[in-house]
């Protein structure tokens, strides 16, 4: 008889988190609050996209924002100037948020009468894809300067998101970026994904993005 046990810690952690995420989703559903988990690598334009989104939707719905960073309040201070409710989450060195951390943030934010909460996850293409936050939908930003090979290098991230925003299309002429190749690679991983080209800087494509998002929020609240 073996004198030790083998514990599948990673499997156990994921299973526990998945259960907590499902419970959180049920709570948000009852409150009619839509949670968007927005992921990307650092420097992709997440915060600028969040600002554009708030500006476009602030007269249609009440919006809250959870800003996740390892250690900083820069983005939270910027977003707070829009008038949206903001909570800064410091992950203490962790490169992602899980369902428990997200719930803590939502409790701090207060979701009463909040239609949409945007969770700006930690800038990383690996860890955030592995942990269900309890979000209603998952979104990702890929910026043109990052290159068109990211779906090949980080397939899990592209396979779990509902919508992909390809940002910084205003800089397309300056980079060797094959937009059609990205769409083809992504749809092999995730056939139902919505792909929207945008420029958070100029505002191009933002209308299509907010129409998609507002429709998802309404559908979530109507079910």
Show which residues each predicted segment covers.
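Nucleotide-state-sensitive switch-loop elements of NTP-binding domains
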Residues: 3-26, 31-39, 44, 53-136, ...
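Short acidic active-site motifs
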Residues: 23, 153, 205
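Hydrophobic positions on the alpha1 helix immediately C-terminal to the Walker A/P-loop
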Residues: 49
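Active-site glycine-centered loops adjacent to acidic/histidine catalytic or metal-binding residues
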Residues: 69, 167, 199
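Residues at the C-termini of beta-strands that transition into short coil/loop
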Residues: 90, 142, 199
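Conserved C-terminal guanine-recognition region of P-loop GTPase G domains, centered on the G4
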Residues: 128-135, 144-192
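Canonical P-loop GTPase G-domain recognition
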Residues: 171-223
